Amino acid sequence: MQTAVVNRASPASLNRTGLEQAVNVSVSPLPENGSTVQAVIAGMLVMLAGTIPRNILFAANLRYVPSLPWAVPIVAVYLWIFWRYLSGDGPPPETRAWRRSSLRANPLSARAWTLALLAGGLGIVALVLGLWLANRMVVLPAQDASELAGIPPLTVWSLLLVAAPIAGIIEEAAFRGYMQRPIERRHGPAIAILITGTMFAVAHLDFTPILWPYYVAVAAVYGMVSFLTDSIWPAIVLHTAGNLYSNTDLLLHGKAEWQASAGPSELVWSTGVDHAFAMTLAAFLVVSAGAWLAYRGLAATATTPATPPSGQI
């Protein structure tokens, strides 16, 4: 699988481009097993350096010449440069090995790819079913596409669909790479996933405390795949697929996926356990069991990946 290789800009190059200061802080050399605080700071700075420019460009696109998605190619170029920098390219040479190791973009065998995507895919399906159940048990925050009204469809679809892989790449690099890897080496995957899941939740603008378990569950799906394969590539694919589903569902139905179940919208405490709730619960249990078995299979066959060729997996 060919990957977009990204040159890492060093403090000197970043200062010239206006990106350097943010990234330079996030990629200062850290020990391979640096402290939890260092890992959290590094991951959050990577996330901010990757998402803030995208958000600014997308907002500008919606305000200036909104009839054309002109921000898409600019963001794509920025992402390419940013990825290369995170993966070890560019100065300073003293941080190249640390950046490459922290990114965790290691190659995988075909078998590891298959099992990782199977386990993570079942995990995502279980998450969606779990959200449908949660929406019948508690009041989840509403999410709709009303703020996109009046924007040309070409621009809306282009920005939201392109946002899916961008978020997948940047957030996995930040949370499952730079942040999770050093924490799991010091404290194990459970604590690492709990911490990264919490920070993953805080990083989302729509976060409310009631959604914290959901974000930790998302971190568990992606984090365990990354831990068992020692690579963020499957998580990037899964994250992108999940975002594509969510964004497409939002545009087609005008509301979030957890509000789109076919059953009654009333809380189960008022309606009782109806047929829709029972069927969703049964599906959730079956899919969750399948995901658990798939993760066990992935754990049984996990191997240490070979050193990746430059820019490839």
What function would you assign to each model-found segment?
Residues 2-33:
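Short, Lys/Arg-rich, polar N-terminal cytosolic tail immediately upstream
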Residues 37-95, 112-116, 278-280:
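Alpha-helical transmembrane segments in multi-pass membrane proteins
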Residues 240-313:
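C-terminal membrane module of polytopic membrane proteins
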Residues 48, 52-56, 211-270:
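Functionally important transmembrane alpha-helices
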Residues 189-204, 216-219:
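Small-polar-interrupted transmembrane alpha-helices in polytopic inner-membrane proteins
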Residues 170-195, 224-231:
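Membrane-interface helix/loop boundary segments of multi-pass membrane proteins
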Residues 59-67, 97-170, 181, 185:
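Juxtamembrane helix-loop-helix connectors linking adjacent transmembrane helices
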Residues 169-174, 178-179, 183, 202, ...:
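Active-site His/Glu-centered metal-binding helix of metallohydrolases
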